[in-house]
UniProtKB/Swiss-Prot annotation:
Protein purpose: Removes the pyruvyl group from chorismate, with concomitant aromatization of the ring, to provide 4-hydroxybenzoate (4HB) for the ubiquinone pathway.
Descriptive protein name: Chorismate pyruvate-lyase
BP-aspect Gene Ontology terms: pyruvate biosynthetic process; ubiquinone biosynthetic process
Pathway(s) of this molecule: Cofactor biosynthesis; ubiquinone biosynthesis
Protein's organism: Sodalis glossinidius (strain morsitans)
Root EC class: lyase
InterPro entries, per the entry: Chorismate--pyruvate_lyase (IPR007440), Chorismate_lyase_/UTRA_dom_sf (IPR028978)
Amino acid sequence: MQDQAIVAILDGIRWLQEPPVWPDDATRSWLTERGSMTQRLEKHCGKIRVRRYREGFVTACIEAWEAALLPDCGRFWLREVVLYGHDRPWLTARTLVPAAAEAGPAQQVLSLGDVPLGQWLFRHRPPARDVIQFGRVGTLWARRARLRLTEGQPLLLTEAFLPDCPLYISGGDAPQQ
């Protein structure tokens, strides 16, 4: 599957209005992970590879639910990526940062390049997570969260767990070969 099709999965997420009934404890553990998802994935492959699909400033093309969770500034930094483990796509993610964050701690997000967001986010003090919601795309799981950085700056992160992700493997925390 091409990165364009993988990233398009983010647009098809059906967000759940109620907390989900988890199929098992492993799924719940993955979806409610409060630490770095990058670190959790790297336990299964050693090193995550990031492929950027789209990155740059956008205006007015964000979804209504995204706008409701971020300050009304009209301009946002958008980063859409696919994370690969063992050369297989495991997770696709979208990060939105208000343009006003260019002057604060979030300015480093604008220059991450191929560095995983989680590697930067959890390097020092973990961000506060004040909103989290779960969703589905067919049989795939997704989550979105508003994170607050050190000065309270918001960052919106949406993640969809792709079919080859260790989440879906029986015993989802056993390292893969």
